[in-house]
């Protein structure tokens, strides 16, 4: 049985709102370690018929969970974030880096990630502007997907934003 036809991707991030994390029971000072263990635990559940995981923050014995994901060995894990340790997290337990767009630094960090990786790491970016030159620069740096934020507004402004992004994509594609 496969619910998504093998299209599921598991996107995670360590978070930024410390008050919200504390309100949900996560000590913000330990969030990076908690995130890593939670991802490792999910990988155990996805890949083992009878999964156990014993970490400092996540601990369980002999659980069963089905259906298993269609992707082997597990769905891609997309690590979001722009913080100083994000590349280490991608290399430790991720399959892709999914930063927020920033006009400076992301392309250099993508090159650093690729040079440090001993395996393919997918690159995608969230929040790009409607600008063909930006899309081109990210594509040349190895980014394969770019997401564009839409305004929280009525239909007219949203449609205009979509039109601008569509025009940028068309210019980037050479249409």
Where are these regions (language model features)?
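Active-site-adjacent structural elements that line small-molecule/cofactor binding pockets in enzymes
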Residues: 1-175
């Amino acid at each position: 049985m496969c619910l998504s036809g093998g299209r599921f991707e598991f996107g995670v991030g360590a978070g930024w709102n410390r008050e919200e994390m504390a309100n949900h029971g996560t000590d913000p000072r330990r969030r990076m370690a908690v995130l890593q263990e939670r991802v490792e635990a999910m990988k155990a559940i996805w890949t083992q018929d009878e999964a156990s995981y014993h970490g400092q923050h996540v601990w369980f014995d002999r659980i069963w969970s089905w259906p298993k994901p269609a992707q082997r060995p597990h769905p891609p894990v997309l690590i979001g974030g722009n913080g100083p340790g994000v590349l280490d997290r991608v290399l430790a337990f991720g399959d892709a880096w999914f930063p927020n767009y920033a006009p400076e630094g992301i392309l250099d960090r993508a090159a650093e990630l690729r040079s440090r990786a001993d395996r393919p790491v997918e690159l995608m970016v969230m929040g790009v502007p409607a600008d063909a030159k930006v899309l081109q620069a990210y594509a040349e740096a190895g980014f394969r997907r770019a997401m564009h934020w839409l305004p929280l507004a009525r239909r007219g402004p949203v449609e205009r934003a979509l039109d601008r992004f569509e025009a940028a994509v068309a210019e980037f594609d050479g249409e």
